[in-house]
UniProtKB/Swiss-Prot annotation:
PANTHER family in the record: RGPR-RELATED, SECRETORY 16, ISOFORM I
Subcellular location: Endoplasmic reticulum membrane
Species, as recorded: Emericella nidulans (strain FGSC A4 / ATCC 38163 / CBS 112.46 / NRRL 194 / M139)
Keywords: Autophagy, Endoplasmic reticulum, ER-Golgi transport, Membrane, Protein transport, Transport
Tagged with keyword Membrane: yes
Bias type Low complexity, positions: 905-918, 1519-1530, 1854-1867
Start-end of Pro residues biased regions: 603-619, 741-766, 893-904
Name of the protein this chain belongs to: COPII coat assembly protein sec16
Region (Disordered): 1-57, 347-385, 465-956, 1462-1760, 1773-1904
Entry membrane topology: Peripheral membrane protein
Regions of compositional bias (Basic and acidic residues) in chain numbering: 565-574, 1694-1727
Pfam families: Sec16 (PF12932), Sec16_N (PF12935), TPR_Sec16 (PF12931)
Encoding gene per record: sec16
Amino acid sequence: MENSNSEASAVWNPALRTDDNHETAATVEEISAPVSSDVAPLTPKATTANTDIVPDAIDSINTESPAREETAELPLNEHTHTVPGAAEPVNVGSAGFIETAEAPPTAIDDPGAVPVAVSPNGETSAPAIATDVTSVSENTVPDVTESSSVEPTALIEIAQAESATGEDFNQAETREEFREEAAELFSAAADENQETDAFKPQAELAAAPGDGYNNLQSMQEEHVQEGQTHQLEIDTSVNAAQGSSDYPTPGWVYQQGIADHATPIDGELRSTNHDLWGSPKSVDNGEDRFFDQLRTQTKPIYFPSEESRFEEGVPLLDGSAEAPVEAAPVEATPVEQAVPQPGQLDRVFEGDEDEDDGFFSSAQQPATENEPQEPVHIQRKSTSQVLDSLNTNRDGVHSPLSPTAEEFNDIIAAAASKSPENVQEPASEEDLAARWQAELSDDDLEVAPVEEDLAAKWQAELDDDDLLLEDEPSDLAQNTAAEVVNGHGVEPNLQALGSPFGTPQNPSKPKPAQSVYTPHQPSTADLVQSVPIPGATPLSSSAPYSTSYFQPRPEPPAPAVRAESFAERPKEGYKSPYDLPEDLAPRRKPATKPVVSSAANVPAPPPRSSSFTAPPPPQSSSGVPVPPINAATLPPASKPNAPVASAPKNFYEELPLPPVRPRSRPAESGRYTPKFNTASPAFVQPPPAAHPVTNPYAQLSGDTPQSQLQQPEKLGPYANNVGSSSQSAPAVPPINSRYSPKPPTLQPGVKPPASPRYSPAPPPPAAASAPLQRYTSQPSVIPGQTVTLPFQPRTSSPLAHHEKVSYQPNEASRKPSFPQPTSPVTGQPSHTETAAPMSPRSSQVQASGPSAVDTSSSYQQTSPPRNPYAPPSYLEEFSRRVSHVNNSTPSAYTPPPETPPFVPPRRSQTQSPTQQQSGPRLSVPSVDPLKRPASVHAPSSPTKTSHTYAPMQPSSHIRTISQSLEFIPPSDGQELDPLQRWKGAPIFKFGFGGTVLSSFPKHVPRYSAGQTAPKIKPMPGDVKTTQLKDVISFPETIVRHPGPLRNKSKKKDLVAWLSSRIAAFENEGVPQNLQAYPDSYKRRDEKILLWKAVRVLVEHDGGMQSTPDLQEALRGILFPHLQTNGLEPMYSDSLQSFGAEVINASSLSDSAESKPLSSIRNNLLIGEREKAVWSAADNRLWGHAMIIASTLDKSIWKQVVQEFVRREVRSNSGNPESLAALYEIFAGNFEESVDELVPPSARAGLQMVSKVDGHGPSKDALAGLESWKDTLGLVLSNRSPEDHRALLALGRLLLSYGRIEAAHICLIFSRAAVFGGPDDPQASIVLLGVDHVHSSPTALLDDDAILLTEAYEYATSVLGASPTSTLPHLLALKLVHAWSLTDQGRKSEAQQYCDAITAALKATTKQSGYHHQHLFFGVDELSARLKQTTGDGGSWISKPSMEKVSSSMWNKFSNFVAGDDSDAASTGSGKGGETGFGPFAQISGTPTVSRSPSVTDLYGQYPMPVAQQVPGAGTSRYQPNNQNAPNSSPDQGRGRSSLDSQRSASFGLSYGQRRGSQEYGHPSESPMYGGGPFYGSPTAGYQSTPPQTSYMPLAPVEEDMAQQAYTPPTATPQGLFGHDLPYQPPAQNPFDQSTGPEAPASQHTEADGYMPPTGNTGYEPPASNTLEVEVTEESEDEKPRKKLTMDDEDDDDIAARAEALKKAEKARKDREADEAFRKAAEADAKKPAPAKSSWWGWIKGGNKEEANSGKPIRAKLGEESSFYYDKELKKWVNKKDPNSATPARATPPPPKAMGPPSRAASGSSMPPSGTAGLGSRPPSVAPPPSGSPAPSSLGLPPTPGLGPARSASTGAVPPAGNASSRPGSSAGPPPRPSTSLSHASSIDDLLGAPQARKGATSRGRKKGRIRDLPHLAYRSVYPCIANYQPPYIVVNLHAISSGSMAWLLVL
């Protein structure tokens, strides 16, 4: 024993002495001789590392855990004492200073070496010790597994490894106290135990520089180089016992006797004797061996005297197996007691476990807790520095112990007292090794047991270290780990010790701890990695020890107790460097991870290189999550670990593997694998093999990161790789997502322990896929490195290699969603990537911070495996710690194998960029620090970043800039073109009919001698002709639109098309045109409602009459969930919007409840008003009942009033707005009803606060808008006289808030909406669903909107049996649609639309301002071009023939006047092409032009008047003078509208002139005309026209004016179809009704053919005169009407004059009418007898006319029979004849009378009424309000007058005003056209097509009937003839035929 002790002391002293003075070195030499083979000497470099390392370590560790930040310097006695827990004697003589810091002292060259300063006297420098001890107490239990002649840094490193756990031996005590306690413990031990050679003075040790010492040093250096950490199981207490010259194990321990301090900081007591355990020093040999084994474990292969060391180690281990308690931290509760030896050792572990502050476990837990503090990167001090720092204690071993030292001693004593039996009993080497490993693993000591048993246990304990973080997450894991740690029945106490140091599960982990300090750790890491491979398999009961990271899953089964923890341990192993301090905190002891014995291995790699930093990153990803997993999984695993005692052999077998480290590094995934193992059992035990690695990775990420974080802290760039490999290696399996390919490889048998960090390079292929999975996106950064990485494990941190490898696979995996679920991809990739990129240790140190840890752990987490495999507890823990990391990891996981090639060249883990990423991952700092070296993490983040983008790069093959070839410039000056157009560019030309011409330039390469690259000669390319539809896909509907809609046969097809479009809208998302609006979803739903509403109208033939079916259909679309046939409760349920109860309903006794209101509301929705009344009465809602009853029979009202007891209290129930609005409507407050929805204050932008309902939640003032459907449904189901006004107000309200679709629904159901062009300020609707006010003009080009509006027009006109088109402005939009069809190549359909437009223009005699030249030309042009392109063969320019032209012109003119088909032909597309095109194209259009022109002339005035505004407008319509000049100029000036652009400028002008003059005098109109975008003039015209000039004919104007005069809404609600203006003036409708029948006919006649003459001022006055005469003769009935219109016109001219004229006109008309009737009666009475036979003919002819005439005809018809009887009697004759004669004449007269009077004074008088009052267009504007009444009249759809009224109102009303004003201005001409036009138009509309008029013309003319359009036209001409000689007329006609309108105008 003494020899062994001396050897051990040599070993210890060398390590200590290296730090110490020369004396120590001598002693070390002496002692090291025997031990040298086994133990790597600790380099005293660490001495300086204490101070130097601490800052760096703190930097790296801070992120990981505060524990790391602290370093524990323990004084070692000069004399080597065998610590019962230590396999080797510890040289206490040299002041052993163990610096434990979360970050491995990068300054220390030997990762395994812990800087220990031992004074020659065996004292450690007090100050240094104080500080160091404090850190040790807080963060780590200094373990001195090995001593290096030069460096005691191994001890320090061990301490650091334990400190990596993040817990101090005694967190509560300061370092000084700890040192003091340790010194006391050591002194006590020295006193009790006989001094052995081990305790010889350092001088002796130095004197014995024999082979042992030198060998140890050399070996240690080798280990450092190898990256293998030497885990010297020297109790920190030994170091702490600065004052004791000897290290008496048992006695010393007993002296301390404090159970709390039962466990030395190391977690192992290394005294010459196993006095600590109460066993004699006989154990010394075993202890020596044990430490040798630990060193060997770190790098056993490297010791030449490895076998001897093992031999010594066995006895020492045997003796110390029990004895070495691994000084469970004072706080640590004995988690693991060696089952084999329940002696003091067990007790010690118990105490540690109970305390739960086991040094390692506490370190681990504190690491987690301290994680936020980010352990300082500890750099090893040089031996001299350590010695200097220890100088204070150098005075003597017996120098007073610092409180920390005393505490340490107490811990040791407690441990000895707890398990004295174990200490005394020298267990067999295997038993000792197993127990020792268990305990060491608990403590996370870096002592490698000699035997594989020890290795297995060691791994388990190291796993515990790895689990340190996990231990915090799950106590279960810790407990299980404790049980498993011993595997021999080690008590939880022992496990507690183990957990403080590391999970006892990983016997090999002690080495990882060494690896933290020594380069050997890579070997340990390899071992750890071997465990990670098992980790790939479920870690849960696989033997962690046997699994040693080198063995695949098979190993884990053997040490099933720790298998899980082992795999995870590796990550813990990263912690293990930190675990020394953590071991102090037994919290880690639970060592759920002990099962993952691999953790032990993990620590080794981390020790040296800054990988310490890297561990933190892994921690965040895998580390954080791992703890829960390890805890949960490891406990079971730890139990198996105990049996795994045999595993240590495997462990040593695996040790040889370190040479293969390249693979093991790839296997670093193995490091993660342990994590996987831990996690795997919970979630993915079956998949663990390869993908399990990924899962394990996720799970391991929790556990492993801790150990990884710890170990990596000390690891050098490569040591980090090893360390993080070993400890974070368990994480590798989780990294499997990251390194998943590798972990599988490692598990199979690759010795991952050391390699995981660096070995990733070899395995990258296997692991690469996993890394790719994890970092799939990052490979791009790695690609270059990938190849080298496999072979550069050392050159760059293995993590870097793994990153790349893992990232590449991850890249693929990241793409898959699977990895994403696991955790955020970013975290994962960043972790690995950072580690890899950051090779420098400095960066490692940086990374070592929690952030670094976070990064790496996040990296691990990134792998999806964590989610799939990690146990919930693990995930929760991890998520709590590293939520950020988790987020990043998920995607990376899926394609783990993907990226082997990307593995970047390894970077020193010190550089690990993890720190960079660590910042974000600080949430998991404690875990990360423990988990992995910073370097590991650092590579992760860079890799992550690179991979994150790398996958993108690989996926999108990097595109290099295409070689720019030189062009051969031209020599003709084109080369000077700054645009270089000579190089050529694609050319596209869009032609008619969707034809596209394209030409791409050709670049011909020209090669010349001596040039490698050719020059480019641009050449013109081929011209290709394609169809636009082949280039641009136009939306196709399943059902083709059946348009144009011209007859009822299209109804079925239209409904099918509407249904298909609605279905498409419902299946589509928000249209692009609505996405910019905040309420886009509401707008989308309302758009669908609008389409459904139009479909309902089509299905019900326009809904002209309200029927139950129609109401039901409307309710179906407004309230799809409402079932009218259901019970009220059903309604209340289905209509929650109506009856939703308010939680905060008013508590007033009389307040209405929401349920009764819902019942009332629902009853009203279905039209059951009486039921609603009694429902309200039953619920005591008397106010509701009374309001509803007021609309019912008086009897019901009386009953309700009798029942009514108290006043109504407004209900506070939800959504009362719609009911309140309905009640307002019932009360007659139509316009104010909308205030119930949105209060005026809200519309004004004010927010009002209610003091009444303050108890309820504040309500959005605009929330009432959402009740528009309820309000509409209530109104439609409960119609009241003027409710359309309320709907109009509601529509306007919605329009003001941009709810276009909802507003249009309300407007169309109000049947009073004004449809007009975009230039019409009165128009509320231009196209359904389009906001023409705020939207761009292009919105009007929407085909869907055009077709929907066409469908509405079809429903209301064709299906509604309306005689005329209700939307004259829509013709121009149909033309736009025709052009759109042409562009799409649908020429036949476009031609159909042209024909339909032409027919519509011909069909109506009263033309709207929208029917202008531009429209005519546009239709003709498009039709002609379509005919040419469709193969008519006709040329664009037909050979002109004067005969054809003249004949066609004359025919067209006559047809135009008569409205015959010939006219249609002239204007129609049929022949228009022939006659209209060519040089005389405009002549051919002249008929059209002549129509327009005359109109144009009329409107030509308007353009001028438009500018003039009202007066101009009014006069201009009828003023020929203005019309003439303006006619041409206005059109031209106006320029073309969008449509007009295609046409001649005159097109726009004519329209504008016409409408402008008619519609408005307002400047607004004129600007609109000028700018009329769409229709050119129509724009202005549209706005004005719908209301005023919707009907170009003057007659309509008269009607409109008359109607306007009749402001009352007598007209029926047909306004639905009419424009607001037409319908708005109800007066028009009633007036039209009376006069309409006759006047319309005349209007049409004049309008169609007659308008041009009207336009001519020359003959208008005469016409008016003549007409007046005729009117008086033919029909005086219409005169009254004319009076109205004339009055309106007069008003336009002059208010006073208008009024006077009106009065005069009215009186005169009345008189004339009476006279006419009298004369007619008399004439008839006279005629009857002679014309008896002919009388029948009169009757026949007259019947038709009489039908038109109306009452007189009917009465006469009845009298006819009497007439026969009384043929001779004049009475009979007088009665009948006058009646029959009068009716025919009477009918014509009104138009005539209208015409002349309106043109003349009468005409002017009428216009004044309309004009003056309405102000031309302005009146129409005013009409909107009147329009509401008009709508009501309109609401009377049945009224036949409506057709005319509607048409008239549409445009006629404004025309009336205009006409009136115009007549006023030009008294003569306007009246006549207005008269005839207005009547003709209305009559024509009612009677039908102009053809009938045609026939009647001759008769009509004779009879003076309006129907005879030709006659009317001539009649209008006749007055001119009467006034002017025929030559004038001839000239006029000739001028028309020749196409020169100027003559006509002049005349």
